C-alpha cells in the first residue's frame, strides 16, 4: 500500500496523530522535499521524532523514475511524506495515479496547508480566492509575465490571489523579491497592484504577517523562509479590520 502523509507547515510536530501512526507502522518511508519544505526542522529531526529511517527523494525519483517507490508499495506498506497537504501538488497526484494503474492500494492522510493557513493569518475569506500562481526566479532571457496575468484576472473578478514564491536547492524567494518582480511585470503590461500581504513562517510560533503598499512591505524584515504573498481584492469590512489589527494595514 502507498500512503501519502502531509507533514503540515513548519516542523516535526505538525504531523497528525494518524499520520505518525502510519509512519511508524510502515515498512519504508520516503520524503518528497522539493515542492515544499519544513523550515523549522531537519531531516535528522524527522528521523528522531518519527522513529523511522527516511529516504529523501529527488525530483527525478518521483516524476521520472518512481519504480522503486511503487515496487516497495506493491510489496509492503510505504509512506510518502510531503510538506503541507499531499495532493495540492500535481506531482503527488501523478504518483498516486501510477500506483493505481499497477493495482496498488493508496491512501491520503491530510496535513495543514498554506492554502488554508493564510486565511487564518490574514482574515481573508477562503471562498474569495481565485486561481493561485507562482513567481519564479527570473533567468537570462526569461522573465515570465504569467504570474501578473493571473493576479490581474483575479482582481478583475474581485478575487484574492495566493502567490507562491520560488524554492530552489539553496535559495528561497522572499517577499521583497517577489514584490519587485510583480511590480516589474505590472509595469511591462501597463498594470498596477495597490496592496500586498506578506506572510512568513506560517505554522511557526512566530509567523510574520504584514499588509500594505509595495514600498511599505519592502521596508519590512520578514525574517527567514518560507514566505508567501497575497494580492487582495476589494476587502470586506471584516477582512479589512482583521488586517488592520493583525497585519498592520493602514487605511
From Swiss-Prot:
Binding residues for S-adenosyl-L-methionine: 9, 85, 88, 113-114, 165, 202, 227
Keywords tagged on the record: Methyltransferase, S-adenosyl-L-methionine, Transferase
Pathway entry: Protein modification; peptidyl-diphthamide biosynthesis
Endpoints of the signal sequence: none
EC number: 2.1.1.98
Record GO terms (molecular function): diphthine synthase activity
Enzyme class: transferase
Regions crossing the membrane: none
Gene Ontology BP annotations: methylation; protein histidyl modification to diphthamide
Reactions listed under catalytic activity: 2-[(3S)-amino-3-carboxypropyl]-L-histidyl-[translation elongation factor 2] + 3 S-adenosyl-L-methionine = diphthine-[translation elongation factor 2] + 3 S-adenosyl-L-homocysteine + 3 H(+)
Pfam families: TP_methylase (PF00590)
SUPFAM superfamilies reported for this sequence: Tetrapyrrole methylase
InterPro entries, A to Z: 4pyrrol_Mease, 4pyrrol_Methylase_sf, 4pyrrole_Mease_sub1, 4pyrrole_Mease_sub2, Dphthn_synthase
PANTHER family the record matches: DIPHTHINE METHYL ESTER SYNTHASE, DIPHTHINE SYNTHASE
Known partners and oligomeric status: Homodimer.
Similarity annotation: Belongs to the diphthine synthase family.
Role description: S-adenosyl-L-methionine-dependent methyltransferase that catalyzes the trimethylation of the amino group of the modified target histidine residue in translation elongation factor 2 (EF-2), to form an intermediate called diphthine. The three successive methylation reactions represent the second step of diphthamide biosynthesis.
UniProt protein name: Diphthine synthase
Species for this entry: Methanosphaerula palustris (strain ATCC BAA-1556 / DSM 19958 / E1-9c)
Amino acid at each position: 500500500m502507498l500512503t501519502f502523509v502531509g507533514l503540515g507547515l513548519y516542523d516535526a510536530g505538525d504531523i497528525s496523530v494518524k499520520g505518525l501512526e502510519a509512519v511508524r507502522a510502515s515498512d519504508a518511508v520516503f520524503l518528497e522535499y522539493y515542492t515544499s519544505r519544513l523550515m523549522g526542522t531537519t531531516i535528522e529531526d524527522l528521523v528522531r521524532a518519527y522513529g523511522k529511517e527516511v529516504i529523501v527523494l529527488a525530483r527525478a525519483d518521483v516524476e521520472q523514475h518512481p519504480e522503486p517507490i511503487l515496487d516497495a508499495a506493491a510489496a509492503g506498506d510505504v509512506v510518502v511524506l510531503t510538506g503541507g497537504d499531499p495532493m495540492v501538488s500535481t506531482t503527488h497526484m501523478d504518483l498516486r495515479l501510477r500506483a493505481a494503474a499497477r493495482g496498488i492500494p493508496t491512501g491520503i492522510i491530510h496535513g495543514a496547508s498554506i492554502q488554508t493557513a493564510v486565511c487564518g493569518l490574514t482574515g481573508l475569506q477562503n471562498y474569495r480566492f481565485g486561481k493561485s500562481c507562482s513567481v519564479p526566479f527570473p533567468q537570462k532571457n526569461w522573465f515570465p509575465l504569467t504570474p501578473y496575468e493571473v493576479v490581474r484576472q483575479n482582481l478583475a473578478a474581485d478575487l484574492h490571489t495566493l502567490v507562491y514564491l520560488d524554492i530552489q536547492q539553496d535559495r528561497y524567494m522572499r517577499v521583497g523579491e517577489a514584490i519587485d518582480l510583480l511590480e516589474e511585470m505590472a509595469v511591462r503590461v501597463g498594470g498596477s497592484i495597490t496592496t500586498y500581504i506578506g506572510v512568513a513562517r506560517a505554522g511557526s510560533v512566530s509567523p510574520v504577517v504584514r499588509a500594505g503598499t509595495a514600498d511599505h512591505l519592502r521596508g519590512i524584515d520578514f525574517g527567514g523562509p518560507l514566505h508567501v504573498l497575497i494580492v487582495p481584492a476589494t476587502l470586506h469590512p471584516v477582512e479589512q479590520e482583521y488586517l488592520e489589527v493583525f497585519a498592520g494595514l493602514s487605511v
